[in-house]
Amino acid sequence: MNQEVMNLFNPQAPAQTFDSIRISIASPEKILSWSYGEIKKPETINYRTFKPERDGLFCARIFGPIKDYECLCGKYKRMKYKGIICEKCGVEVTLSRVRRERMGHIELAAPVAHIWFLKSLPSRIGTLLDMTLKDIERILYFENYIVTEPGLTSLKEHQLLSEEEYMIAVDEFGEDQFTALIGAEAIYELLASMELEKIAADLRVDLAETTSDLKQKKLMKRLKIVENFLESGNRPEWMIMKIVPVIPPDLRPLVPLDGGRFATSDLNDLYRRVINRNNRLKRLIELRAPGIIIRNEKRMLQEAVDALFDNGRRGRVITGANKRPLKSLSDMLKGKQGRFRQNLLGKRVDYSGRSVIVTGPELKLHQCGLPKKMALELFKPFIYARLDAKGYSSTVKQAKKLVEKERPEVWDILDEVIREHPVLLNRAPTLHRLGIQAFEPTLIEGKAIQLHPLVCTAFNADFDGDQMAVHVPLSLEAQLEARVLMMSTNNILHPANGAPIIVPSQDMVLGLYYLSIVAEKEPGEGMIFADMGELQHALENKVVTLHTKIKGRFKTVDAEGNPVLKIYDTTPGRMIMGELLPKNVNVPFDICNQEMTKKNISKMIDHVYRHCGQKETVIFCDRIMQLGFAHACRAGISFGKDDMVIPESKAKIVAETEALTTEYEQQYNDGLITQGEKYNKVVDAWGKATDKITEEMMARLKAVEFDPVTGRQKQMNSVYMMSHSGARGSVNQMRQLGGMRGLMAKPSGEIIETPIISNFKEGLTVNEYFNSTHGARKGLADTALKTANSGYLTRRLVDVAQDAIISEVDCGAEIGLTMQPIVDAGQIVASIGQRVLGRTALDPILHPVTGEVIVEAGRMIEEKDVEIIEKAGIQSIRIRSALTCETRNGVCAKCYGRDLARGTPVNQGEAVGVIAAQSIGEPGTQLTMRTFHLGGTAQVVDSSYLEASYEGTVKLRNRNVVRNSDGNLVVMGRNMAVLILDATGKERAVHRVTYGSRLFVDEGDTVKRGQRIAEWDPYTRPIMTEVEGYVEFEDLVDGLSVSETADESTGITKRVVIDWRSTPRGSDLKPAMVIKDKAGKILKLSKGGDARFLLSVESILSVEPGAHVKAGDVIARLPMESAKTKDITGGLPRVAELFEARRPKDHAIIAEIDGTVRFGRDYKNKRRIIIEPNDDTIEPVEYLIPKGKPFHLQDGDVIEKGEYILDGNPAPHDILAIKGVEALASYLVNEIQEVYRLQGVLINDKHIEVIVRQMLQKVEITESGDTGYIPGDHVDRIELEEINERLIEEGKKPGSGNPVLLGITKASLQTPSFISAASFQETTRVLTEAAVAGKMDTLQGLKENVIVGRLIPAGTGGMTNQIRRIATARDELIIDERRKTSGSAEANAMLVDMTNNAAE
């Protein structure tokens, strides 16, 4: 009540409405206009009275009163004197909170450079003056003079003079003949005297004339800054400060602690230093002190101001009393604890609580159990209001008492208040939007929150002590959003891949699986049941068991809703489950008449959701959960020692493998294979042995046994049931328990040759245990490190994609991407159907045989279409993609396609960028947290053969094969592929075969599925001859380019090419083998070059000089890297590397044109390769390749654009430049997907495409035309297109540019919004740049709006903003009408009125 009366006297000014925020450099006049007075003394408060000192840092006269409506001396108190200035102490009588907004200033006795513009790279002052930072610092810190006006002397303008040189010049020319200044005054003069228009014109002329790249870059940088100053209206001399602003005292408080000490903000210390030094300098100047003393004081003042703005940027960090660096103004903004991230983007929430969670299996999906104590505390305001309304209390105080005493009527009211008032539950870490969901609370006893088991997957929660936070949505709008958008019943599908996320797991799966098992020879086999009643009766009387094979009549409905009866071969367990299925024509009994593994249950729920809608699905899920729990409990499936079966054949397999390894050891001792080859073979052999033992073990576990007495089937192995159903445990874990643990990895990632032969059931020997500790510990260490890495990746992704919002329905783009199935090692890992589901077709999709239209252009591809597409065997489809979308701000709904979390076309306003970022980032954390589940056991990944994945006829593309001396077909081509065609001649599979592979089929052969097509040695790469003849060595000089290395352990020698460039004598050698005929003439290759084979470092020679070789024989081998284990460790950094668009370390070199390979003159230790184009209009392209890199092209080879000259991972920038956007997109999508696929994580392609779109938004200007840009500028792609359209209309010359790929960090920092960029990273740099350019932030993205405290322009906030815009436009129209009819005074009054309404 009192507050309301106060508000009458103290009306709040309506909040300003604004559409944009501008940042620029403050001029001295501006700083003075903010200030309420000058601070002259360094004192803070009086130590006895605790009142602020006059003219000090907390002065009440300048900043306002300490107590509301009370002057400092106490003469004026109370509201009635509001606005009076006390004549005794000079304090205005007003609210004390003005101390949070009133600023002061310090007038400096000498100008000081602003450290941000000086030291933040690139130095703005340096670039503008075209001087190096070192020189400027020399002037600023009083080491050198600078000549500003040489007059008629021999000195040059801007020449630096040391103290001595200055003295000599003064003696020589006289003091008034020239002007040389020192310190910040000098820089001030230089900046003030700059004529920016003239400089800009000169720079443009220079730019046009210069040819050197380096100079051009430098001129462009300078021109850019000059233009920034011209456009923004900033003056260069404002970068030198004569007045320092002082921030309001309540933002740098001084708090008395008990014991008479004070806690103070570091800023006060820093300000104190500035004031002290400034006052001392003033006094010294008044006293006319010697120049050297004044200079020293000026330098100290400069350092003090530097420390205030950015402590530690230059020189030593200034520390406080406790040796801790003081936090300067910059540090207040920077980093996780800075203003942006701590207070503006992350705020504390009232009306919230947290507690431990326990499982609530009897809850409905939309409910959660809330402890009464918590509910009472959280809903207090609502309870008070209700008590008041019902007349139980007349004041808040009374209501408070009632609630504190917990009177019975309070509990009744709590029940009323809580009814249908959703609360939000959140579990940290909130990695995706399903980490916060709304539930309806039900009151429970106890102190733990109850959580529905089905939502655990979404929260990634378990009940081993996890805690969750509860938040209460207060306003009606918030409650509405919570219910309609965030209710757990609305989040059935996973936003990352569109699969159900409300899926039973663990016990529930086990129970349902147990229900669906079929057993042989059970009692009552073959009985027929008419309905569920009969069946229940039979079950209760043990006539049949849950697993008996029976015939049952099942009741469903047809399309009209009439009941239909049908008889199925099934089991009673499955009938019980079928009872729960929603009655719908599209949900047949067959869907649960199968083994219910976790996969099948997920499919069933998905099917129900697609055909019966959300409500039915939710009811079905709840029922199926209860059924699962009940039967898991009934079944009593447990885990016993004897459930882990060790296969009898284990000893035999181990003995065989040990014999093999001994044989390899012998071969190595005889010198037939190298150390590396032996290692690879041993590791391979043990890997195969482990797999074999695992297979035998699984076969034993799976085996069905019968009881000899009753003849009934024995109970299945319970551990096998757990694993096979998907409830818990994997084959890998079972292998370690009952098979053999297998190979282990060292912390470096290499595999240890000796495996762990024991399993956990037998127990490990001491040595084995020691070997296994590596992996286990590395797993734990990795987990801790990677969680942070993955979180950082998510943060960068969110930042780059935050402004990708669905902003229109259709952009009308006529370009898109081509989708094809992804084939890996002959296996289809992602079918075309999976990839195009939920996307919009770009062109009509036609049936290849009948030619009828399956999907029209512009229609979304649904599940039913996918079935037809898969059956028809269509191999490539053009679809629309966010990547090629032409919407200006955001993405259009057509290009995006289906909203995966809803299963419908995406709505306008959906923040697809953030969803994409969360979908990619969330599993990153999952994966990293899951590295150690393998217990460090190694997985060897290397294939050495190729099997047909389909039946069909073989066709060889780019056929190039020869028969070698063993009579095998050997592949000689670099880009040869084996195609398998079906009966209609359609390609069913394409397999690339590597150079040197042995082929078992030839053109026209027919193959069966699983037949071997080719094999190769995965550990070495062969160098083969194409012609028959005699070998001769060239430049293979012992000790220089070739060394006989004797193996330490065997004494056998092998000849290896060594790095010949390390000695001066060998620098000109080109080690090679030549094939000659009998007469000693060098033979020619088919392509016309000589038969000379250049050898790289580490090649092992396989033939002796003079040996006779046939085509296809191996003359040398190059060892490959030994097999490393694959783990997401390679994964997360790999994903980050791809998103950051970094050039890989040894990146591939890609041919830019089609042509013929020629070898040029070598350059130092690089090999020069020239591609002569087939088209004479193009220039030849040169590449320099380090010698000693394994390089497989020969002189005269024909090469296609985009082929690899040097193997390795390609740099994404090269793909973009050479093959274009679509190839880049498919490369990035496939590479990133491969990492996730390896871990079994499904992410829809469109999420990755959205991020890649954000990385490809800029073009680099190559031809500026009349656009006003400078070549080399990065400009928004769509912005450039718009400017060009306008220029063409006006008949001017348009500009052109090449698309550039920016890494996600770079792209985030280059957003048009400086607020968003500053809150992301490198805050000082972003703000400095923005201030110089006088940037305007139009508040388009999400972050900017959160920071200024508005609704975000996405989702419901986007609609609200739109409505507000429409309303404002309407108001303006009405006012215009009024203006025309009546006077302007009335219209203005109306405008004020409307503004106030809007503000309220």
Swiss-Prot record:
One of its GO terms (molecular function) is DNA-directed RNA polymerase activity. Its cofactor is Mg(2+); Zn(2+). Mg(2+) binds at residues 462, 464, 466. Belongs to the RNA polymerase beta' chain family. It comes from Brucella abortus (strain 2308). Binds 1 Mg(2+) ion per subunit. Binds 2 Zn(2+) ions per subunit. It comes from the Bacteria. Pfam families: RNA_pol_Rpb1_1, RNA_pol_Rpb1_2, RNA_pol_Rpb1_3, RNA_pol_Rpb1_4, RNA_pol_Rpb1_5. One of its GO terms (biological process) is DNA-templated transcription. CDD domains: RNAP_beta'_C, RNAP_beta'_N. InterPro entries: DNA-dir_RpoC_beta_prime, DNA-dir_RpoC_beta_prime_bact, RNA_pol_asu, RNA_pol_N, RNA_pol_Rpb1_1, RNA_pol_Rpb1_3, RNA_pol_Rpb1_3_sf, RNA_pol_Rpb1_4. The RNAP catalytic core consists of 2 alpha, 1 beta, 1 beta' and 1 omega subunit. When a sigma factor is associated with the core the holoenzyme is formed, which can initiate transcription. This is DNA-directed RNA polymerase subunit beta'. NCBIfam families: rpoC_TIGR. The keyword Nucleotidyltransferase applies.
